[in-house]
């Protein structure tokens, strides 16, 4: 039996700016379950929904890595790997190889992708300290520094 569920408010780019960031169960790369809501409301958060095979994500990577260093201790960065043609092990090897120092999670069931109405990989959501979405963007050419500033 299918149960209808209300979807969060969204625009063509996913969730609408101004809405409260939802939680969703994902897992760490070593298999522990974690809810995205555990990152929300404790300070600004940048969520990136990405994949190893995503060329736009690869284009965003240097910008994300620079911001992770620049805003260390001020902004939490969370990379949410989608499960399409991926595995936690492959994602872990990639994150290690490229020196990721921020949180990397795996969306095993697609719960986070659904909760955030992710239109495609390279989708970035910036959430302010109060848990409100202040930016959403898609593609390899995003002005992430300005987006992070909106979350501070």
Which residues make up each language-model segment?
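N-terminal "domain-start" segment that seeds a small globular fold
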Residues: 7-37
């Amino acid at each position: 039996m299918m149960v209808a569920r209300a979807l969060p408010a969204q625009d063509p780019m996913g969730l609408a700016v101004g809405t409260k960031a939802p939680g969703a169960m994902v897992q760490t790369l070593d298999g522990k379950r974690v809810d995205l809501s555990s990152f929300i409301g404790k300070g600004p958060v940048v969520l990136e929904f990405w994949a190893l095979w995503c060329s736009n994500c690869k284009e965003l990577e240097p910008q994300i890595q620079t911001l992770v260093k620049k805003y260390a201790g001020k902004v939490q960065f969370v990379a949410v790997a989608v499960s399409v043609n991926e595995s936690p092990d492959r994602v872990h090897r990639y994150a290690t190889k490229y020196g990721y120092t921020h949180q990397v999670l795996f969306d095993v069931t697609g719960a986070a992708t659904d909760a955030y109405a992710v239109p495609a990989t390279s989708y970035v959501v910036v959430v302010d300290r109060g848990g409100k979405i202040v930016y959403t963007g898609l593609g390899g050419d995003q002005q992430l520094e300005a987006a992070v500033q909106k979350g501070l």
